Amino acid sequence: GVPVELVVAAPERYGTALVRATGSAAYVAALEPLPDAPTEAGVYAALGLPFVPPELREEPFAGAPPALVEPGDVRGDLHCHTTWSDGRASVEEMGRAARDRGYEYVAICDHTPAVGAVRGLTADDVRRQAEEIAAANEVLAPFRVLRGIECDILPDGRLDLPDDVLAELDWVQASVHGGQRMPGGEMTKRVEEALRNPHVRCLSHPTGRYINRRPENALDLERTFEVALETGVALEVNGLPLRLDLSGDHVRDALRAGVRIVCSTDAHSVRGLGNMPFSVMTARRGWATAADVVNTRPLRSVLARDR
């Protein structure tokens, strides 16, 4: 079973109990003795300290805490699917729903054929989908629907679509789906080869995990971060509740290595666009600020191929 700890506190000490329950032992010890306060903010005020969000209560640090990314900082969703592959809404429906959430842009990233379990887009499909995206942009302007793809990384590191097709797109996500049990050296070489493709902008769900269903693959993340930094490829924080990949710990390691991240929903329906808070909360656990997240930027910056 899953252990559960129930904390009961009087209203006037509720904030104190929250700080104790959300901080690590080392962090709380550095604050002792904690004053009684009804709110967390009250605890910090009584100590004469700036408020520290729960995600940062791991270890004591000097100075003001960084301003972590908030859901409201996100300007667009860069990983969504439609009925062209395994999604349940059309291009226009996904675009309209993203616009209604206050976004400035959304990238349609349907699968390519090698994904196997679902229908993937061929080169001809990608070009036919472009017509539907153009029509949606006429209706939804100034909101922008981006031409994207979630392109499978083949076992040898090649991508599942030719370069001339990828060059036409606004946003290319590279993903491993099959072969998750590949040995670490082979998996790392496979992903590195894909990251060196000049059209790739982001590596999707890098560790391939399904929480409580499938463990992380054997990808050498330290090496992957080095290559991502060298090539300018961002790493995704996938907001599907089963994935949350990168994890908070991996996000922190990526940021320490100088790698940028993308907060995405991997939405397969209009409802799936609501996964963004899960992605942002995971990024926050890795101490991500808005400046660390590609899609907190305006569209012109996202489209700039500043790898």
Label for each model-derived stretch:
Residues 1-82, 88-102, 106-108, 113-143, ...:
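Charged catalytic cores and adjacent phosphate/nucleic-acid-binding surfaces used
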Residues 148-151, 278:
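Active-site catalytic microenvironments in core metabolic enzymes, especially phosphate/sugar-handling
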